[in-house]
Amino acid sequence: MKAVMQLGMRIRYLRNLRKWSQEDLALESNVNRNYICDLENGRRNPSLEILERIADAFGISLSELFLGVETIEGL
């Protein structure tokens, strides 16, 4: 599975843990809701700035956001 898909699944998992809608995460992170949707579905390759905003919204570090995500394709 591609890293971008794994990252999207991780973001969805963290959002669901908090019982947040995509709109809730969008408001907390100042990221467009459609972008959040695309990100969760592996259709976006987010910038570091976007990832930092999302991690901050969840109250976690950037490294925690990537837990369980393979960062090297093909492994």
Predicted segment positions?
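Conserved hydrophobic/aromatic packing and binding residues within compact polymer-binding modules
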Residues: 11, 25-26, 36-39, 65
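Recognition helix of helix-turn-helix/homeodomain-like DNA-binding domains
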Residues: 30-45
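DNA major-groove recognition helix of helix-turn-helix/homeodomain DNA-binding modules
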Residues: 49-64
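A detector for short, charged/polar N-terminal pre-domain segments
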Residues: 1-6, 73
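Short, charged recognition helix plus adjacent turn
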Residues: 56, 66-75
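Short basic helix-loop element that most often maps to the first helix and adjoining turn
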Residues: 9-28, 53
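Short amphipathic helical patch at the helix-1/turn junction of helix-turn-helix
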Residues: 5, 16, 44-45
